Amino acid sequence: MATLGGVSASRTRSGPVREWVTFEDPADDGRRWQIDVTFLTSHWECIFGRGCQGVFTEPAPEMVQGCCSYGAHFSNRKDRDRVVRAARELSDDEWQYAKAGRAKGVYAKCGKDEEGRIEWRTRLVDDACIFLNRPGFAPGAGCALHLHAMRSGRHHSDLKPDVCWQLPLRCVDEEQEDGTVVSTLSEFGRDGWGDGGAEFAWWCTEAPEAFTGREPVYRSMGEELRKMLGSDALYDQVVTYLDQRASAQPPPAPHPAETPVQFTRRRPGTNGSRRKH
């Protein structure tokens, strides 16, 4: 259950009011979750190939690269090895760069973390992720791993890198002085990209055109949310709470990109005041 007093509205660094709810983790006594009610009850949806402008300093919808232009950074070795195994399943008609991937591998070094450990990401081919099929490829542009998941009847989170299937959700763990951990599950904003995110001409969680889904995020991304929370019991608690919160009054604090802007049009010949009869 949500902890007593766990619901709050607070301001993020970018300014807008955002609503949160706090849960104790039933599977981990030392972990507490802060859940972004505002984003999870919004109607964001991925619009890859349907208006996505990409992640460049200038809009580039014609490239149909989505957020795949810089490769995917692996969260750990387990993540990397899972993707390597998935790549072995891909056929030539699913993967445009199959020949390159099989010849040189699908990952490459990309620097070191703060502790000096080597970091890895998916290899780049023609200035984008090796798994990204480009416009003109027979099945269409998009992720080869995602395509294979659809064809094989699996969820794409079983095959794609963690960061890819989680987007635009993001979980950040913060260890407290008493040794407990606070896990904050919210949207993946520009800051998730590091310093370069601020230079993007467009980002989907700020774009009203991406908030047109038929279901709220916690429903449309239910499988992703379940895996990120790590336990069915916690997932069920979160969904039950959000179902109740979404139908309650007043409604949850709205996402700034989803809030409609209303304009008042004056009738010709009036100064905006009511006309006397």
Q: What is the role of each PLM region?
A:
Residues 1-277:
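Short loop/turn segments that flank or connect secondary-structure elements
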